[in-house]
């Protein structure tokens, strides 16, 4: 796990191969459903490197959007330069996931959705050239919180849920990147913000 995480961080902050971000060298497969619910929020986008010369499976980096659990969508994985910067290296497969928001369902539905997405991605790893033992989750704000929850709850059956057709597959992740996601919920609204998190 340590080696994989270090490798990811080096790619995030390297600059040698991260130019021309407007000309992606990856194929985007949109709106893949990771459950059989029919809910438009139960979808993800997949980013597959073009021109792969090696047949070995690649690590997967999963982006989880922020928005105080009240807003946001999977398009942020493409619109922000964060995930594309990593994928431009050609060393990773990427995914950006939707999850249900707090105006539709209450916690822990959001982590159920994220875990269902991880199970689906791992269940389809061979199809998309993903190494099922090297899955990292990366999120900002509320997405950072959900990434952290994925990292610490792999043995917690109460947070697993039963969504999707891969309930027998592990939702464990090997690396977590929490980008300013909250951990002290009783304190986070003590600081100025455009969003009232307590309303989520």
Give the ranges of each region predicted by the language model.
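Short beta-strand element of the alpha/beta-hydrolase
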Residues: 56-68
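Primarily recognizes the serine-hydrolase "nucleophile elbow" in alpha/beta-hydrolase
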Residues: 116-192
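Short amphipathic alpha-helix adjacent to the substrate-entry channel of hydrolases
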Residues: 75-95
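A fold-wide structural signal in alpha/beta-hydrolase
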Residues: 60, 88-98, 136
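N-terminal cap/lid segment of alpha/beta-hydrolase-fold proteins
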Residues: 17-56
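Short beta-to-alpha linker loops that shape the active-site pocket of alpha/beta-hydrolase fold enzymes
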Residues: 50, 67, 93, 98-102, ...
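Short, solvent-exposed loop/turn and secondary-structure capping segments
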Residues: 57, 72-75, 107, 149-150, ...
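Serine-hydrolase catalytic-loop signature spanning alpha/beta hydrolases and amidase-signature enzymes
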Residues: 68-71, 75, 94, 120
């Amino acid at each position: 796990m340590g080696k994989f995480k270090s490798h990811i961080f080096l790619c995030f902050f390297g600059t040698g191969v991260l130019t021309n971000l407007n000309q992606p060298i990856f194929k985007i497969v949109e709106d893949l459903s990771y459950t059989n619910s029919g809910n438009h929020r139960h979808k993800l986008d997949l980013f597959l490197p073009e021109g792969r010369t090696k047949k070995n499976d690649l690590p997967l980096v999963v982006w989880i959007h922020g928005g105080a659990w009240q807003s946001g969508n999977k398009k942020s994985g493409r619109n922000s330069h964060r995930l594309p910067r990593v994928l431009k290296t050609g060393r990773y497969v990427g995914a950006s996931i939707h999850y249900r928001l707090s105006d539709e369902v209450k916690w822990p539905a959001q982590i159920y959705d994220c875990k269902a997405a991880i199970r689906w991605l791992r269940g389809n790893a061979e199809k998309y050239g993903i190494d099922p033992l090297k899955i990292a989750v990366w999120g900002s704000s509320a997405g950072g919180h959900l990434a952290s929850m994925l990292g610490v709850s792999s043995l917690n059956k109460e947070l697993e849920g039963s969504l999707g057709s891969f309930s027998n597959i592990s939702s464990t992740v090997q690396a977590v990147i929490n980008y300013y996601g909250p951990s002290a919920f009783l304190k986070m609204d003590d600081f100025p913000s455009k969003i009232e998190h307590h309303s989520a």
